[in-house]
């Protein structure tokens, strides 16, 4: 491997919040040694979104320089739930839920990361045979005071909110993963800093060289306020339909455009700087930049054709208000009329009754191009239902 310092500097600077220890990591990258790059995922949810993609792109960039990704599927820790950034204890998942989520997760992971340069490891390989004495031995290396030094634990403790013993174990279990795979570098968001540093400590305790740590920024979701999260509904999933990805990109606040370009695309820095100047001077319509962002993303996740088709569909359906020819169809149960709320859920236009009612209250539901506000309005065969700006379904 013969990488230039400029290449490495670019990888370590753009879309990176902090590197520990940067000079040591840079020396490792210049050494020519094939590094083991650890990324862990708890499949507590089956989908990967752009927030995850920020770190995955870093992995891919380093894979392209010849390094090896080691993906840890947290089939054990997912049953606990990572407490990072959590204000309450998270519910535990069943082993069956975790396995089902992991299957989907892996399929989406390899939309971004090179499968041929990835080693997939499951925590159950080492935790499956763990005994109580092993847990005691591992936990004895750390103190409760160290765990309570975590910002999120400290806040919950001060507020009198519960912190389960399993949550206190979580950082140690994640750290032990690093020991088992002999990680050279671990990747994560800035909210993972405590866990990542515990990994360094434990490796030193057992005589391994401490892993370097690369942290990426937290991507703000489409609401412009909170961290991107499926539970908050402010996410863009990497496996969503191209038209859905395109439409969601168009909905992000203008002030997030440049951050998204930097973190999830390969647009050159100078071009992003030009976009910033043009926006500040009112020389460009933000919608044009959002379309460029959506196209860049779809080309990465799908291909250029999918990007072009999604762009054309957005222009027809959203900007011109045309009814799409390729809308999904939904069969009415027993061919009988059904209430609009039930149809919206049945067709997948909304995921819950509360979401469907909210769309009605916002005046965002139409039947055959007429706005509907009464939740008892019936839907019959042949009706075309629109929910939101770009979702359609035909009753058959």
Swiss-Prot record:
Its main location: cytoplasm. One of its GO terms (cellular component) is cytosol. A motif ('KMSKS' region) lies at residues 227-231. Keywords: Aminoacyl-tRNA synthetase, ATP-binding, Cytoplasm, Ligase, Nucleotide-binding, Protein biosynthesis, RNA-binding. CDD domains: S4, TyrRS_core. Its EC number is 6.1.1.1. ATP binds at residue 230. Residues 338-396 form the S4 RNA-binding domain. It is an enzyme of class 6 (ligase). Catalyzes the attachment of tyrosine to tRNA(Tyr) in a two-step reaction: tyrosine is first activated by ATP to form Tyr-AMP and then transferred to the acceptor end of tRNA(Tyr). Homodimer. PANTHER family: TYROSINE--TRNA LIGASE, TYROSYL-TRNA SYNTHETASE. This is Tyrosine--tRNA ligase. The gene is tyrS.
